[in-house]
């Protein structure tokens, strides 16, 4: 069964015709009206019904025109046009934000509801980045001493040596899934490119796009905050509390997806090699978190108690946070200096 897009195509073509006669604010306003009425976004059912050849295009459109959240209220009378996009104030319940319509050549490329406050001011500022840079240097120097930071670091390394078979096994499994995803992208480049666009759009929604042009220090703060809170704490260490298995499953799917979307099949080899250290370091931090969850499970199986296992999980979280900080610094320099 072919993917049913006749109405969608009509709307896009109408947008193109509007562009010749109307300003960008009016083009965006009319598009948002159609979007809120449910006449633009494909449903998941329609995506799942699409054929193999149609799936990349279906996913790309789903990511570009996601269904609006239920209860979203948009002030269409106060558009703000700047730099290829039109912003409308919006609310979702008590949560503030804005609907952003991205235009290119008079055509609506994508639309999204961007929530306010996903990145706190500290995580977008030069002061926040400078603090993290100085703290990172202090942290690295302190590891050579005898203080708490050094003691925790040595205990974490001792655990890695003690359980090296489990640690190496997790590295082989998770890095292997990342490599497998990269290879699969060579077989399905169209689908991989659609997934890549979806991941890129998700990063824009959290505010990282706004920080890209503010310099290395704000980038450092934003990247580290997001990777630490969302990547390590919420999706690795917190699931790791439930006997480690949820964290392992989440990261297994994440590594396969990241490999698929960030494959050299899609990215020029020089850029891929430049970004590879970031990928390896960030993924290593999440491997450490998954390893901590596995140690928690192993402690219970050995009847050593949940508290012992929890301590080991937190030690791995400490080590992962250290790795993430230096990964964020490298990525901030990479994006803020070399890729500008």
PLM regions and their residue ranges:
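Hydrophobic secretory-pathway targeting helix
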Residues: 1-22
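Short solvent-exposed beta->alpha transition segments
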Residues: 26, 41-83
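Short, aromatic-rich amphipathic segments at membrane interfaces
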Residues: 102-126
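Selective detector of the "anchor" transmembrane alpha-helix that sits immediately C-terminal
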Residues: 122-146
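Terminal transmembrane helical module of multi-pass membrane proteins
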Residues: 288-340
